[in-house]
């Protein structure tokens, strides 16, 4: 989720705290992946989104599932109310506030790096 040159990052309650994550979740039966994005963002942060743009997918062996990466924009107020049983923290950060991301294969890290690089180099996300 992007808003005014910032990206929404989080730390999952039971996850790693050495790098940021993006909001994520699983599709429910009968739900499109676009509906999943909107629902998961709202459930975890109480934020609404618009202008969803598919980035790419990645097989995820840990849960035997397929990840779908989307960039989207905030639609409405930017006040974050986290789902405390899932998230330890969620906040808006500028590209300059994104600290070094460990070199790993996770799609979420690739997307955060792309946001940072594109915003610094071009002033906008290049998709």
Where are these regions (language model features)?
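The catalytic Nudix box helix
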Residues: 22-55, 70
